[in-house]
Regions:
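Active-site groove signature of glycoside hydrolases
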Residues: 1-3
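Substrate-binding clefts and catalytic carboxylate motifs of secreted carbohydrate-active enzymes
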Residues: 6-180
Length: 180
């Protein structure tokens, strides 16, 4: 499988560079796969990864999620290319609170982002982060989606901010670029 992906994507990568007179960077997103066997993503100009440590992987265990994510970041750092965490998040039911940050509470979503962002902030090669998602959105019904809704938004479907929206306002509102 990794070789088949490379054989498909790498010629497109080369063609994009060949056709672009401005020589803009080319990337693709590495989803929840075995990153150590991925031979395609590492050939791109920018490494983009979608990761859900602490949510789908190591669900609710933020300490071990941070450990696993740091281990993966160690791997990507050896590739010597800029990295963007292109998708990450935790479902949150707006208005659901708890004394401890348990999954689906607004407090957990904030702790999730603090944990993952703490890992990112330690790495100079990380050049961006894209939380999933701006706002909750409708999805196909199923056992993982209460009310047929993906609730990873920083805002509700009605655009009411969750606690995480305030967290990111503070995070992104800092003046210095390295003052993450």
């Amino acid at each position: 499988f990794p070789q088949d992906a490379y054989d498909y994507w790498h010629p497109l990568y080369e063609l994009a560079h060949q056709l672009d007179p401005q020589n803009r960077p080319v990337t693709l997103v590495c989803c929840q796969n075995d990153y150590t066997k991925d031979i395609t993503t590492r050939t791109m100009d920018i490494v983009c990864i979608n990761r859900y440590y602490g949510w789908y992987n190591l669900s609710g265990d933020l300490d071990n999620a941070a450990y696993a994510f740091k281990k993966e970041l160690d791997f990507w750092e050896t590739i010597d290319k800029p990295l963007i965490l292109s998708e990450y998040g935790a479902d949150t039911v707006a208005g659901m609170h708890g004394f401890a940050p348990e999954m689906f509470t607004e407090e957990f979503q904030v702790e999730y982002y603090r944990t993952i962002n703490g890992c990112l902030d330690e790495r100079r090669f990380v050049v961006g982060e894209w939380p999933w998602n701006f706002a909750d959105f409708s999805t196909q019904q199923g056992p993982m989606r209460v009310g047929s809704c993906n609730r990873k938004g920083l805002f509700t479907r009605e655009r009411t901010p969750k606690l995480a929206a305030h967290y990111f306002r503070d995070r992104w509102g800092k003046k210095e670029p390295n003052d993450r």
